[in-house]
Structure formats: structure tokens, C-alpha cells
Amino acid sequence: MSRLSAHVEVASILRRAEATGDFATIIKKGDSERGSLLMLVSSRGRHIACLERVLTLNGGYRWQATGPGDSAQSAEVAGFLGKRARFDEDLWAIELDIADPERFIAETISAG
């Protein structure tokens, strides 16, 4: 099953956040075609969740929670991102500050 190029999916995530008046930025740029995606979701500067696009058994992709959980300190989130970036040079990391993070996460996970 094919998927969108990483840079196209990242652009879509940025537009989706900005369309609702939220903040989104790329904090690590990976391979434009095949890079893995990691979203760091916060609300008013408070960390809420990390979401990663993963390959499923049927060959599709979906988003799942990973890394530090709700209200993790910024040092813990930065450490997690640093380890992931060293392990995966193709990684894209997107930081989002969302007014309604629970809704954003639910919509993202359900959309795959």
C-alpha cells in the first residue's frame, strides 16, 4: 500500500493546525520521501503527547502514542527526541501547540 511522501504529509499537518489558529512548526527535517513522522503535541506550552506514524501489519499506516506522556517536563521530551533523531536520521519532528489537543489527537489517530 502506498503512502504520501513525508514532506507532503508534514505540510498537511502544518496546514491543518494553522487552519484552526493553532501553532505548528518543523523542529527536525527528515528525508522528504521516506522519513518517519513524529508529532510533539502540547497545549499552552504543556506537553500532552507524542504521536508517531507506524506501519501496520496490513501494510497501511496509523498514528500511535509513543514517548513521554501527559505533562512530561521539556527536558524529558527533548531527551526522547534527541534519542529518536540519533537512531533515525530520516525522522521528521513536528511541534504543535493545539488549543484542543484531545480532539486533535482523536481525529489524527482515527484518520490513520
Can you name each region flagged by the protein language model?
Residues 1-112:
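Polybasic/polar functional segments that serve as interface/processing modules
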